Amino acid sequence: MIMKDKIKGINTICTHVGEIKDEQFGGAVSPIYPSTSYEYIDAEISRYPRYSNTPNQEYLCKKIAALEETESAMILGSGMAAISTTLLSLLDSGDHILFQNDIYGGTRNLAEAQFDRYGIEYSFTDSLEVSDFEKEIRDNTKVIY
């Protein structure tokens, strides 16, 4: 059996998936790139930490995707960045999101301070019961948080 045909275990995935070969010095492990600025070699490709496309970030995304057995992964700088990125990618003007009342304050602030300007409707329920959530679902409910 050829090595690439074998099922990889978690240790192999954590160690080898997404490896960056050290072409310059021949290091046995992927180098760490401490830079925050990169030369614009091509106008179409701009590396920048906020774009999550530096070599270190790409390396980590490949590892996470392999561990989660998914096509790709995304890393973000904070939990709130993950929440807002997810919600704003799923919701459009005219959509509704239903929240449980006891949510993280940053998420509540996102809804109350930003969703109106985007035309996103939102409501809260005090209950934890599925049946109570079901009663609050509207025709335009797209997310239950």
What would you call each of these model-derived segments?
Residues 80-83, 126-132:
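Short acidic loop-to-helix transition motifs that present clustered carboxylates
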Residues 2-55, 62-63:
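N-terminal "arm"/small-domain region of PLP-dependent enzymes with the aminotransferase-like
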Residues 89-107, 125:
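Conserved PLP-anchoring active-site segment centered on the Schiff-base-forming lysine
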Residues 37-84, 106-113:
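Conserved N-terminal alpha-helix of the aminotransferase class I/II PLP-enzyme fold
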Residues 67-71, 91-94, 139:
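Short helix-loop-beta connector
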Residues 113-129:
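A glycine-rich helix N-cap at a beta->alpha junction
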